[in-house]
């Protein structure tokens, strides 16, 4: 089936294209052009100046629509995912905060089952914790926070292949071994809820930690201890040229001036925006 969107405001790598046209065949984009002449045989859809842009890939969200992925049930997952689908997201990595092993296993079972469905928007499970620095716990559940334990994480990784990302504080005992192990299994290791300094970050990067979770949040920046000044986690991550970062781009978690700084240093290829949505009715909240 051939479909043509006309009178669209289209986001392209070169910027916004006004009064453009998108030609689609069987769900695949064939052409984006500033010519909105009707194509013979195409079903015309006049979007009347509305925005047309690529679907969002949400890499860090804890829930939505009044549901939390930590409920671990299929109903909770569906409710949250469907909420994201209403607002431009087309695929998602459901995120768990620091959890117990039974919670992780239940969520992983739900995730695995739903990923097997035709055209599933779920790309994998993201574990934010529970190997985090207690001093930087923030909104995490402190009773679940601990140091990396291979007797715990190895069986989880071996049994549940839906896990695609796991966050940790690299300064913790055992964190380097953890990073090397999970990256060897194809899981993204990300720095999170941490007090890591430059040597910690440099060593972590070499051990496989290539991403930073909600950059600037739950991690220190430049600081002073007595008469000496030290770089923080933030500056250390900037110095890792190929390390990617995610930012909560709501203007509250990170102010607009800092967002511009992140963009200026990391560039569009090494940063992304996340919504970090919990159980709010919609991302707008």
Language-model features: where?
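N-terminal metal-binding scaffold of metallo-dependent hydrolase/deaminase domains
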Residues: 1-38
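Conserved phosphate-binding/catalytic loop of the ribokinase/pfkB sugar-kinase fold
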Residues: 133-158
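Divalent metal-coordination and catalytic microenvironments
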Residues: 8, 27, 49, 60, ...
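Conserved small/polar residues in nucleotide/adenosyl-binding loops
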Residues: 278-285
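Divalent metal-dependent hydrolysis catalytic cores, especially in the metallo-beta-lactamase
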Residues: 62, 78-107, 120-133, 160-171, ...
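Active-site core of metal-dependent hydrolases
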Residues: 158-277
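Charged helix-capping and loop-helix junction motifs
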Residues: 75-76, 107-110, 149, 227-232
């Amino acid at each position: 089936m051939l479909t043509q969107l006309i009178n669209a405001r289209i986001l392209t790598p070169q910027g916004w294209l006004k009064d453009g046209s998108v030609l689609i065949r069987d769900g695949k984009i064939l052409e984006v052009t500033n010519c909105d002449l009707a194509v013979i045989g195409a079903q015309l859809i006049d979007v009347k100046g509305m925005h047309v842009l690529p679907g969002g890939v949400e890499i860090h969200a804890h829930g939505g629509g009044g549901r939390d992925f930590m409920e671990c049930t299929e109903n909770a997952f569906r409710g949250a995912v469907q909420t994201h689908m209403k607002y431009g997201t087309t695929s998602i990595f459901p995120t768990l905060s620091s959890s117990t092993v039974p919670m992780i296993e239940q969520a992983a079972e739900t995730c695995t089952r739903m990923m097997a469905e035709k055209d599933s928007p779920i790309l994998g499970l993201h574990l934010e914790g529970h190997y985090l620095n207690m001093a930087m716990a923030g909104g995490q559940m402190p009773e679940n926070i601990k140091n990396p334990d291979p007797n715990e994480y190895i069986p989880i990784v071996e049994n549940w292949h839906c896990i695609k990302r796991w966050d940790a504080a690299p300064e913790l005992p055992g964190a380097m071994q953890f990073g090397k192990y999970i990256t060897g299994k194809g899981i993204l290791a990300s720095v999170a809820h941490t007090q890591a300094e430059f040597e910690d970050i440099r060593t972590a990067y070499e051990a496989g930690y290539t991403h930073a979770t909600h950059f600037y949040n739950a991690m220190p920046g430049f600081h002073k201890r007595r008469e000496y000044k030290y770089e923080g986690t933030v500056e250390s991550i900037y110095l890792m040229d190929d390390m990617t970062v995610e930012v909560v781009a709501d203007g509250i978690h990170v102010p607009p001036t800092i967002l511009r700084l992140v963009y200026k240093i990391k560039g569009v290829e090494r940063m992304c925006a996340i919504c970090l949505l919990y159980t709010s009715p919609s991302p707008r909240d």
